[in-house]
Amino acid sequence: MGKNTGLVYTNEKCIVCNKCISVCPVPSANYAVKLADGSSRIEVEGDACISCGACFDACKHEARSYRDDTEQFFQDLKKGVKISLLIAPAFMANYPTEYQNYLGILKAAGVHRIISVSFGADITTWAYLNYISNHKFLGGISQPCPAVVNYIERNIPELLPKLMPVHSPLMCGAMYVKKYM
């Protein structure tokens, strides 16, 4: 991968304040580059970035961006592509009076099915219990957060055997929907 090729990248608003570097848990995920006009900016090393989002929160200049496929999503809906959505329970909690309207708009736009990720959490819980019981696996790391898994994979590989071999609730839900619905 390399510069600006991952999920997170730097845009032209960077003023090299280094706040992104100071909050990043992965020292090798950011580096300074000299641009053709003589100015500098901090780039994201796509292979090292774990996409945790800390730099987004720290940057007051909105110099960090991410690959956004929202436009493609709506284009696909217009073309009639059958799309199902998995919605995090936090969405309903954050928008308790509006979430039904938002989901209704998406359904009217052509979304085939809308499912709560809590459904995937039930599958994940079953898979954890099943794995622990069948393999007598104690002291494992059960982590549905991709940023933590990416961090372990890239920076502490000796912990890989401790990661529970179970997908996140989102992935379990998506796999079930794709296979059975």
Segments from the language model and where they lie:
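Iron-sulfur-associated redox domains of electron-transfer enzymes in respiratory
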Residues: 67-181
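Alpha-helix N-cap/helix-initiation motif
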Residues: 13, 48, 162-166
